[in-house]
A protein has these predicted regions:
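Residues lining hydrophobic/aromatic ligand-binding pockets adjacent to catalytic sites
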Residues: 1-124
């Protein structure tokens, strides 16, 4: 399986064979695509981060409250099932590639556990 990350504004540029899956807490109005909420940040620490912009706080809480509670292999298997066995998916959230976003933490977690992940960078 090939896993990309990207942001909602770039979904329109994804190749046709890539299945986009939102991993945000709340997808944009009008989003008709797939959603996988288990990787979404918890409101409790997300709201504090929105006020403080303390990335270290966010990383600590995202890791302990989200990623450490999940099995990476189970997550990948659930994403495969959700995507109807597509061999290429894109995990989608809001921020552009250079901005802080939990999808970068997800990508690191997946990579550290043997899955190849990269930011989808084709833009039209």
């Amino acid at each position: 399986m090939k896993i990309y990350t990207t942001y909602f504004s770039n979904v329109r540029n994804l190749s046709a064979n890539i299945v986009p899956i939102s991993i945000s807490g709340k997808a944009p109005i009008g989003w008709k695509g797939l959603q996988y909420k288990k990787l979404a940040p918890k409101y409790s620490f997300f709201s504090i981060w929105k006020e403080t912009q303390d990335n270290d706080y966010y990383i600590e809480h995202y890791n302990s409250e989200v990623l450490e509670k999940l099995s990476v292999d189970n997550v990948v298997n659930e994403l495969i099932t959700l995507s109807e066995c597509s061999d290429t998916i894109a995990l989608v959230c809001y921020e552009s590639p250079e901005k802080f976003c939990h999808r970068h933490l997800v990508a690191k977690w997946l990579s550290q556990n043997g899955y190849e992940v990269e930011e989808y960078n084709k833009e039209s």
